[in-house]
Amino acid sequence: MESSQMSNVFHATTIVCVRRGDKVAIAGDGQVTLGHTVMKSNARKVRRLGRDGQVLAGFAGAAADAFTLFELFEAKLEKHGQLSRAAVELAKDWRTERRLGKLEALLVVADKETSLVISGTGDVIEPEDGIVAIGSGGSYALSAARALMAHTALDARTIATEAIGIAGNICIYTNRNVVVDEL
């Protein structure tokens, strides 16, 4: 990408989802970057979805695309009432409706039983170890969360929070202003 184009690209965010015991937590940083400039340091990229707020969600990618992905997923969740079914139905729409195209965003969603990554191209992925991370600092957060899970007795919320903090120390597009929610 040319440097003139690069200066107009939004870089955001790091999201991590951690399961331990009967708890699941999703954490995200608060930084939104345009080119080489931090535009906002306290953005909220983690929220609750569904009628009773029993689904956690966090997004990374282009903000407008992420909000579109949120809305599409939440509509499926309202209609079907179950996380996995809503994700599969959304993926089916991608395969049949050309108008959806390609959204440049990723969504992590979790309820008490399941964690999923939903991509802006209609892919649905379930992590095998209960830990998933997306976004610019996702690799760092994933590594940190896996190490903390393997070598400590910390709870899901603390692991998620610490993983974002560690990613924020390494990734220039991630800060340590953490928002975390837990079921």
Curated annotation (Swiss-Prot):
A Pfam family recorded for this sequence: Proteasome
The UniProt catalytic activity note for this protein reads: ATP-dependent cleavage of peptide bonds with broad specificity
Which superkingdom heads the taxonomic lineage of this protein's source? Bacteria
Q: Which SUPFAM superfamilies match?
A: N-terminal nucleophile aminohydrolases (Ntn hydrolases) (SSF56235)
Where is this protein localized, as stated in its record? Cytoplasm
Its chief place of residence is: cytoplasm
- A cellular component annotation (GO) from this entry: proteasome core complex
Q: Where does Na(+) bind?
A: G168, C171, T174
Any one Gene Ontology MF annotation carried by this entry is:
threonine-type endopeptidase activity
Positions annotated as active site in the UniProt record: T13
* Subunit comment: A double ring-shaped homohexamer of HslV is capped on each side by a ring-shaped HslU homohexamer. The assembly of the HslU/HslV complex is dependent on binding of ATP.
Sequence similarity: Belongs to the peptidase T1B family. HslV subfamily.
This chain belongs to the protein called ATP-dependent protease subunit HslV
Per the UniProt record, the source organism is: Xylella fastidiosa (strain M23)
The uppermost taxa in this organism's lineage are: Bacteria, Pseudomonadati, Pseudomonadota, Gammaproteobacteria, Lysobacterales
